[in-house]
Amino acid sequence: MERVVGAPFHSLSRAVDMLCLNLGAEVERHFELPKPEGRDRRVPSWSIHLQTPWRFVHSGRTVLASGDMYAPFAPDQVGEGWEYDLVGRPAVESSRFDVLSTGLSRRMAGCTVTACRASPLGDLE
């Protein structure tokens, strides 16, 4: 994990219920899919994938947590059949994570990783 120290924050995203913490300068990568000839894309150097409980805390207050992926942003606006794993919906039909992570990503723009270690409990700090 020492390799990410000094890396600029790029963005937050998710793949179903997995947090993607995207760090580092953009690099060009070739992807074989979705077309047979593939395509080139600019992507962050690293994407750390977390499928465990996590949270972002600022001034002692949790501003985004793993449970936000499973909670509707506007619970009174969605029906009983609401599903957390659908993306691309209007904000009132999206998860708390999908709505709040974009603002957190904007606020973290320009930040860099100053330290990274695993605690005795396995937390990334």
Residue ranges, per PLM feature:
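Surface-exposed, interaction-prone regions used to assemble/regulate multi-protein complexes
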Residues: 1-125
